[in-house]
């Protein structure tokens, strides 16, 4: 399949600086020795859900390393920025945040037009976007699309997320035993300060969203996990979600297909607000299997959610996906997991199952190329992904899917499941789910244009 270059996409809202540190056994051991095994073990028991002091970070990190499990924990105390900057050296800074990552991947692919919007654009962030990415501004009462690197505002706040990458096989001692990290992954300390948590389109740009809609075929929205329930100025999540809905509606009035890339939302109340406000007006929604369970739990399907959390069976995920699609009534659900990708849509979707399959294959191939190279800089880079084999559980995935078809009533749906291409030693792991979603969505939109 070739790169669908005749597609134009708008992405919003979240982009940030990712500062990356590669962890080794020595660094981990130093942290354990500094904070004390007993104190760390006690804090692991308490299981802090956010980082308010350094030991919260160390406890959650050690817990994640023992399980070999990718984890993200919000940092809520802005004053800890200096502690992290003094304690760790960053190997590199790159663009993070779903909207930012997706904009750069699509610009690298050379699609027709990429417009990225984030409410905060300090220079340090703007410089990390690729050439070719445009930013919407208003000049003399008109919409002007400027190269994003030139559109920065010095006074804007900076969001920096710290990513601690760990490798399978890294060893350290904890509580008298030798621990070997069972799988590679990353531990993300995500900045969640109030100054950067107002997810919105700024007032002066809002009247021009329909003009942006005329420029693009599709829009990818993300970043709602950064919202707060309450703000010190009296506003709340409902205020920002109302505005976010208006943004989506403005674009849909111009026949723009809207994809929402969901991310894990720790706060149950906020999760429910985002799910019930935003997802029903989207066309396409991208999630992973943990988020299937979170969605089902919000929608009242606790038993099925628990089954997915506990057993992680494909047939449960398919059943859960069909329920989500029906309850929230959007067009297509896209699920990305480490071993398989899945589309669930209603039977009347204009795309054939073969086209849906090709769309997912484009997504996993693009992600494999990015994992192999570390970045997508030109359309030909996509072809590197074609050399990456499908993962070792491919046959098992196919078998499980065939079994699920015999057990579930799927007549009213089109369900497509494909195995993922898995790079054994990835140069990069951050944002691969977003890359899959972006690749799948642009091919989906491209097929719809043909129909």
Swiss-Prot record:
<dbReference type="GO" id="GO:0005737">
    <property type="term" value="C:cytoplasm"/>
</dbReference>
<keyword id="KW-0460">Magnesium</keyword>
<feature type="binding site">
    <location>
        <position position="261"/>
    </location>
    <ligand>
        <name>Mg(2+)</name>
    </ligand>
</feature>
<keyword id="KW-0963">Cytoplasm</keyword>
<dbReference type="GO" id="GO:0008443">
    <property type="term" value="F:phosphofructokinase activity"/>
</dbReference>
<dbReference type="InterPro" id="IPR011790">
    <property type="entry name" value="ADP_PFK_arc"/>
</dbReference>
<dbReference type="GO" id="GO:0006000">
    <property type="term" value="P:fructose metabolic process"/>
</dbReference>
<feature type="domain" description="ADPK">
    <location>
        <begin position="1"/>
        <end position="450"/>
    </location>
</feature>
<dbReference type="InterPro" id="IPR015990">
    <property type="entry name" value="ADP_PFK/GK_arc"/>
</dbReference>
<comment type="similarity">
    <text>Belongs to the carbohydrate kinase PfkC family.</text>
</comment>
<keyword id="KW-0324">Glycolysis</keyword>
<keyword id="KW-0418">Kinase</keyword>
<dbReference type="GO" id="GO:0006096">
    <property type="term" value="P:glycolytic process"/>
</dbReference>
<dbReference type="GO" id="GO:0043844">
    <property type="term" value="F:ADP-specific phosphofructokinase activity"/>
</dbReference>
<keyword id="KW-0808">Transferase</keyword>
<feature type="binding site">
    <location>
        <position position="434"/>
    </location>
    <ligand>
        <name>Mg(2+)</name>
    </ligand>
</feature>
<dbReference type="GO" id="GO:0000287">
    <property type="term" value="F:magnesium ion binding"/>
</dbReference>
<dbReference type="InterPro" id="IPR007666">
    <property type="entry name" value="ADP_PFK/GK"/>
</dbReference>
<dbReference type="InterPro" id="IPR029056">
    <property type="entry name" value="Ribokinase-like"/>
</dbReference>
<dbReference type="Pfam" id="PF04587">
    <property type="entry name" value="ADP_PFK_GK"/>
</dbReference>
<keyword id="KW-0479">Metal-binding</keyword>
<protein>
    <recommendedName>
        <fullName>ADP-specific phosphofructokinase</fullName>
        <ecNumber>2.7.1.146</ecNumber>
    </recommendedName>
</protein>
<comment type="function">
    <text>Catalyzes the phosphorylation of fructose 6-phosphate to fructose 1,6-bisphosphate using ADP as the phosphate donor.</text>
</comment>
<feature type="binding site">
    <location>
        <position position="291"/>
    </location>
    <ligand>
        <name>Mg(2+)</name>
    </ligand>
</feature>
<feature type="active site" description="Proton acceptor">
    <location>
        <position position="434"/>
    </location>
</feature>
<comment type="pathway">
    <text>Carbohydrate degradation; glycolysis.</text>
</comment>
